[in-house]
């Protein structure tokens, strides 16, 4: 399948290319060549390889673009913001605290029962 954009990395299992949206300069997607809907479906060997490639590219992007850090993330299912139903990992370089990207982890610790959540997770 033709990828509209600039491919920055490719091997037998995956490719990485600049996201057309460029949330920040250097926003890159790492994508397996085999179709998986999201992280829940990815073969563990493929996922391990994708993480290694993501780490390499994140270091390369931070160094070569003078970024101060990066967000590395994926979305699983529509409720989590997945709009493309093919697994991919976002590498979003961060340059400063005012680059208009906000990932907010609200503290709800007073509202939840951690023991109950823990028990539900571990009952799987």
Residues of each region from the PLM?
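HIT superfamily nucleotide-processing domains
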Residues: 2-124
């Amino acid at each position: 399948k033709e990828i509209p954009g600039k491919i920055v990395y490719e091997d037998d299992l995956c490719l990485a290319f600049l996201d057309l949206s460029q949330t920040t300069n250097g926003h890159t997607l790492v994508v397996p060549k085999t179709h998986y809907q999201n992280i829940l479906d990815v073969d563990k060997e493929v996922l391990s390889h994708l993480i290694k490639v993501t780490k390499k590219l994140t270091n390369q992007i931070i160094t070569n673009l003078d970024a101060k850090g990066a967000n590395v993330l994926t979305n699983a299912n529509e409720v989590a913001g997945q709009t493309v139903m093919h697994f991919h990992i976002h590498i979003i370089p961060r340059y400063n605290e005012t680059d208009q990207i906000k990932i907010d982890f609200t503290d709800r610790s007073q509202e939840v029962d951690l023991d109950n959540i823990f028990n539900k997770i571990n009952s799987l």
